[in-house]
């Protein structure tokens, strides 16, 4: 990656100031001591990766931040050494198994809450991967592995990312589904969550914003295999074209600073038994757009058609390599 202009580089002092101001604007807690530990432990990842802000529309929810890593690193081991994560956490073996796939090539990134520290470990698998590979690693409990048939039955056969939530002991599995997404397929995927079907205008808005071949994240309880939530994403939505969002998200998108050459705003519509909410992410430093482009993510206004996915789906393959 070429050197960034100084105003686009990650600066720890500026980040602390921006973190406090953004958290105050949305009513989120900050724990400076934990923030300092995070920034020191992962100083190279923040310096060389892309950093972004995250939050949800839920009142009082955390202001979170993530680095998308350009470095191949055991972020879990580093977090354990720094006291940010318990090395005996039962989810650690799952991350280890996923990280060992495909010759050990998956790249780990990490999410942190401003008030609590380590939140998630996030893995990019290097492209389209068979869901069977991801959901059959030995560390995954049998009830989670048993969910594979439910996803394949909906045509969700390929995964690009996964994340573990350390506090909730859950995992998000990010599928790329062949679209275009319509109301019938939306309803089938939504039904996995057991939530109340959303209003027709909400569904219409989701369908209008997701790319043709869409990204849906499915949240699984890592003990029971229960599906807690489903979330549909729209990436790099311009400010002047953003969908209706709750007031807390609108405030977040207005006040969270971005020093990237191109702003990258992400909207996620999350549905589940416990209620629905909106997620938002916003680029900060390190050129988030560049990283997501390199990972073949689709942005608002693009065709959003994955020709490799379509070739795999058309042949009925669930064992294709990375694309």
Swiss-Prot record:
- Give the enzyme's main class according to its UniProt record, as a single word: transferase
- Pathway(s) of this molecule: Antibiotic biosynthesis; novobiocin biosynthesis
| One matching Pfam family | PTase_Orf2
Q: Which GO terms describe its molecular function?
A: prenyltransferase activity; transferase activity, transferring alkyl or aryl (other than methyl) groups
The free-text temperature note is: Optimum temperature is between 30 and 40 degrees Celsius.
The similarity annotation says:
Belongs to the aromatic prenyltransferase family.
Any idea what this protein is called? Answer: 4-hydroxyphenylpyruvate 3-dimethylallyltransferase
Source species taxonomy = Bacteria, Bacillati, Actinomycetota, Actinomycetes, Kitasatosporales
């Amino acid at each position: 990656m070429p050197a960034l202009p100084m105003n686009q580089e990650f600066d720890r002092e500026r980040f602390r100031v921006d973190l406090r101001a953004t958290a105050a604007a949305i009513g989120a807690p900050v724990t400076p001591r934990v923030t300092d530990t995070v920034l020191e432990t992962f100083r190279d990842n923040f310096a060389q990766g892309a950093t972004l802000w995250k939050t949800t529309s839920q009142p009082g929810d955390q202001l979170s931040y993530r680095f998308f890593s350009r470095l191949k690193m055991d972020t879990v081991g580093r977090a354990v050494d720094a006291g940010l994560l318990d090395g005996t956490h039962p989810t650690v073996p799952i991350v280890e198994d996923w990280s060992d796939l495909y010759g050990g090539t998956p790249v780990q990134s990490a999410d942190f809450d401003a008030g609590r520290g380590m939140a998630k470990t996030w893995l990019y698998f290097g492209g389209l991967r068979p869901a069977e590979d991801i959901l059959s690693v030995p560390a995954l409990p049998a009830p989670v592995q048993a969910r594979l048939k439910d996803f394949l039955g909906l045509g969700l056969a390929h995964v690009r990312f996964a994340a573990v939530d350390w506090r909730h002991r859950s995992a998000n599995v990010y599928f790329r589904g062949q679209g275009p997404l319509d109301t019938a397929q939306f309803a089938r995927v939504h039904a996995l969550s057991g939530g109340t079907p959303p209003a027709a205008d909400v569904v219409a808005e989701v369908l209008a914003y997701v790319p043709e071949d869409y990204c849906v994240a499915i949240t699984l309880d890592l003990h029971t295999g229960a599906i807690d939530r489903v979330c549909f994403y729209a990436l790099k939505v311009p400010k002047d074209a953003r969908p209706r969002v709750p007031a807390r998200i609108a405030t977040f998108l207005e006040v969270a600073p971005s020093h990237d050459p191109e702003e990258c705003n992400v909207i996620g519509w999350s549905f589940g038994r416990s209620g629905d909410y909106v997620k938002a992410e916003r680029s900060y430093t390190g050129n988030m757009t560049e990283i997501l482009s390199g990972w073949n993510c689709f942005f608002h206004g693009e065709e959003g058609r994955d020709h490799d996915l379509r070739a795999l789906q058309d042949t009925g393959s669930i064992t294709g390599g990375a694309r």
